[in-house]
From Swiss-Prot:
Catalytic activity: 5-amino-1-(5-phospho-beta-D-ribosyl)imidazole + S-adenosyl-L-methionine = 4-amino-2-methyl-5-(phosphooxymethyl)pyrimidine + CO + 5'-deoxyadenosine + formate + L-methionine + 3 H(+)
Protein name: Phosphomethylpyrimidine synthase
Naturally occurring in which organism (per UniProt): Methylococcus capsulatus (strain ATCC 33009 / NCIMB 11132 / Bath)
Sites where the protein binds substrate: N229, M258, Y287, H323, S343, R344, G345, D384, G385, L386, R387, E423, Y450
E.C. number(s) listed in UniProt: 4.1.99.17
Gene name as annotated: thiC
Length: 624
């Protein structure tokens, strides 16, 4: 728990240096779009020159996707008490289909606003909420289906291309991929983005009340994304700690963040997070609704849930996990499972269904929920409340019965032009993972798949970021669009900052491995650049090009801490005499000096060694 008194909260909520410090040799750059206010951020990684016999060879910079927002831009000063600039506000206003409200329209939002006891916790600079004008639909899917390319779509297209046109010839080589039916173009255009969103194959989570967000896209024909979970609980964390966690997550590469808070002051905590987040924020609204009935699932009502949806939509939540696929007939299917129902949201709704012996209000009021979603452009993340919690329960009838229902609900949401992604498992052994992707594509009509792992074995508590990253890489290759990270603390406790970092890096590896396997254009460029740096013993460039430069440097310095070791032409694994890359370089130098190609140099070198062996007496072992 934080020891900071509430009355000085606003002074306490400041960004820690470690969360906003740019990576070494990295610079925030912006690619200009078609309008002055459309500037797309990238991270430019500079490299050192390669020494050659004739001078120095320039190594071009590498451009990479950047999720850290303006925080890592040293030219921008961000005050967390004021929040981020409303990047998308002019775009939203220009469309002319929304209106500003005088204040919150949810009962709970009004109650919190009028409570004087919360003044010290409240984010001070709250904008009036915005809502669609009567009869209007303000979703990105609706615009896409009208043939409109929004600034958000253009922003996404520029961002996904990662400045491929500037890619050096040295880094362009890429192995052909196997995309399992995905249709990934060589260049992502705004029109392609529009078409994918219109078809429902991709979503751009972009609530009109979260204008601070930098547009991003989730779909299998785009880069694989990762989500990071954070949130307080009844026994831990504070507002300032949750904001800090969000900053930490996006620095290391979180594409979206889910606030799963279940403790005190959920409403106020969420406001602080959204106002300072450049990435989409997701929630599970049933968690907060449950708090409103003191944790008694059977006392939940549609009215309480509806008010919670409006409350969160008007704060700016970009996507809601809603477990509308849990139906009363499916609950008995879990009776013989090894681990039953492991989803929190799933167990809440199962308990409600059994207590009332009828279908859940999430299912029966689904079209009413769609009406709310399209008034704010909140995307559905249709929850997998019956996901397997052990590999023994993988791919059972309960799991797939719910999945088929999610496909039916997707059709209903699309009828309202509401954006949808589908949540997936869970715990699945490797040989059963592909079937999950195939079933999802078959029954959910190519809506983006968003999976928790899956974990490929149950025997590694403390290492579930690894057991799940294996499954995540596989299912990402097969077509999953976003991977929900798992930390080493999964099943054991609440993650700290180091656990969050470890989980994110494990999932960045999984997502990138999937992009490589799919053959996503330009995915291999960073690998090629790092491999070249490794071969040329450019140690600092190796560190800087890695997903975790600080860890790479730390590990190197544990063995070779001297500054001179960073210029050494060998590594700590093999030493100076057995380094395979150094030997290869020696062969190339020999070839150059004697006017030979590499094959001739190897043959000539072997011949010289043979002569030396014979001259020394042709003895295998020499007396010393």
């Amino acid at each position: 728990m934080s020891a900071i008194p509430q009355e000085i909260l606003h002074e306490a909520v400041t960004a820690k240096k470690a969360s906003i410090q740019p990576f070494a040799a990295s610079e925030k750059v912006y690619l200009q779009g078609s309008r002055p206010d459309l500037r797309v951020p990238m991270r430019k990684i500079s490299q050192s020159d390669t020494p050659t016999n004739t001078g120095r060879e320039k190594n071009p910079p590498v451009y990479v996707y950047d999720t850290s927002g303006p925080y890592t831009d040293p030219t921008v000063s961000v005050d967390l008490r004021l929040g981020l600039p409303p990047l998308r506000e002019p775009w939203i206003e220009e469309r002319g289909d929304t209106e500003l409200l005088k204040g919150p329209s949810s009962s709970y939002g009004l109650q919190r606003q009028r409570d004087p006891a919360l003044a010290s916790l409240r984010f001070e600079h709250i904008r009036a909420p915005r809502r669609a004008k009567g009869g209007a639909n303000v979703t990105q899917m609706h615009y896409a289906r009208q043939g409109i390319i929004t600034p958000e779509m253009e922003f996404v297209a520029i961002r996904e291309n990662q400045k491929l046109e500037a890619l050096a010839e040295t880094y362009k080589f890429q192995h052909p991929g196997e995309a399992f039916g995905a249709a990934i173009p060589q260049v992502i255009t705004p029109e392609f983005v529009r078409d994918e969103v219109a078809r429902g194959r991709a979503i751009i989570p972009s609530n009109i009340n979260h204008p601070e967000s930098e547009p991003m896209i989730i779909g299998r024909n785009f880069l694989v994304k990762i989500n990071c979970n954070l949130g307080n609980s009844a026994v831990s964390s504070s507002i300032e700690e949750e904001v800090e966690k969000m900053l930490w997550a996006i620095r290391w590469g979180g594409d979206t963040v889910m606030d799963l808070s279940t403790g005190k002051n959920i409403h106020e905590t969420r406001e602080w997070i959204i106002r300072n987040s450049p990435v989409p924020i997701g929630t599970v609204p049933i968690y907060q609704a449950l708090e409103k009935v003191d944790g008694k699932a059977e006392e939940l009502t549609w009215e309480i849930f509806r008010d919670t949806l409006i409350e969160q939509a008007e704060q700016g939540v970009d996507y809601f996990t809603i477990h509308a696929g849990i139906r009363l007939p499916f609950i008995p299917l879990t009776a013989k499972r090894t681990t039953g129902i492991v989803s929190r949201g799933g167990s809440i709704m199962a308990k409600w269904c059994l207590a009332h012996h009828k279908e859940s209000f999430l299912y029966t009021h689904f079209e009413d929920i769609c009406e709310i979603m399209k008034a704010y452009d909140v995307a559905f993340s249709l929850g997998d409340g019956l996901r397997p919690g052990s590999i023994a329960d993988a791919n059972d009838e309960a799991q797939f019965a719910e999945l088929r229902t999610l496909g039916e609900l997707t059709r209903i949401a699309w009828k309202h032009d509401v954006q949808v992604m589908i949540e997936g498992p869970g715990h699945v052994p490797m040989h059963m993972i592909k079937a999950n992707m195939e079933e999802q594509l078959k029954h959910c009509h190519e809506a983006p798949f968003y999976t928790l792992g899956p974990l490929t074995t149950d025997i590694a508590p403390g290492y579930d970021h690894i057991t799940s990253a294996i499954g995540a890489a596989m299912i990402g290759w097969y077509g999953t669009a976003m991977l929900c990270y798992v930390t080493p603390k999964e099943h054991l406790g609440l993650p700290n900052k180091q656990d969050v970092r470890d989980g994110i890096i494990a999932y960045k590896i999984a997502a990138h491995a999937a992009d490589l396997a799919k053959g996503h254009p330009g995915a291999q460029a960073r690998d090629n650049a790092l491999s070249k740096a490794r071969f040329e013993f450019r140690w600092q460039d190796q560190f800087n090009l890695s997903l975790d430069p600080e860890k790479a440097l730390e590990f190197h310095d544990e063995t070779l801490p001297q500054e001179g070791a960073k210029q050494a032409h060998f590594c700590s694994m093999c030493g100076p005499h057995f380094c395979s890359m150094k030997i290869t370089q020696d062969v190339r130098d020999y070839a150059r000096e004697h006017g030979l190609d590499e094959a001739q140099a190897l043959a000539k070198g072997m011949e010289e060694k043979s002569d030396e062996f014979v001259r020394s007496g042709a003895e295998v072992y020499q007396r010393t």
